[in-house]
Amino acid sequence: MDLVTLDATQHASYPEYCSLLFQGKASKQLSFEQIANHLGRSEVAVAALFYGHARASQEDVEKLCELLGIPPADLSKRLRGFPDRGKGVDMPPKDPLIYRLYEIVQNYGQAYKAVMNEKFGDGIMSAIAFSTKVDKELDDQGNAWAVITMKGKWLPFTRF
């Protein structure tokens, strides 16, 4: 199994605890899916914790420390703090996969907005009251397809 790791020299803007999490993940040879199952959370939510883009509950911290063999004192206060979301990603992104996601919004953002406005009215899709997941599908020829599902609460603009 190929596992994602973190090269802290290339990602100096991430919080220090990110390296601890990734070191524990690598030493235990665990995927985000396996860690997510242990925490009872989604893979994407767990990956966001590892990059410092999400806040962990005390239960998350305890389970992570137990699973990854990290002393709780090293993580508890830092991982329970308020995250600095969005830090560490250049705009436009340089990583090819992240750039493709950016490109999807560039190419289809107006179309998504138009269809959503017609279906829901004037407003926005929340990225706070939000969930997302990634699935893998194989077509009839055996080609792998990435399926990204995003679900956000609709927030209508208010008149004032």
Curated annotation (Swiss-Prot):
Catalytic residues (UniProt): R100, E103, S126
Keywords associated with the record: Lyase
Catalytic activity: cyanate + hydrogencarbonate + 3 H(+) = NH4(+) + 2 CO2
InterPro entries for this protein: Cro/C1-type_HTH, Cyanase, Cyanate_lyase_C, Cyanate_lyase_C_sf, Lambda_DNA-bd_dom_sf
GO aspect biological process, one term: cyanate metabolic process
Disulphide connectivity of cysteines: none
Cross-referenced Pfam families: Cyanate_lyase (PF02560), HTH_31 (PF13560)
EC id: 4.2.1.104
An example molecular function term from Gene Ontology annotations: cyanate hydratase activity
Function: Catalyzes the reaction of cyanate with bicarbonate to produce ammonia and carbon dioxide.
NCBIfam families: cynS (TIGR00673)
Family statement: Belongs to the cyanase family.
Protein name per UniProt: Cyanate hydratase
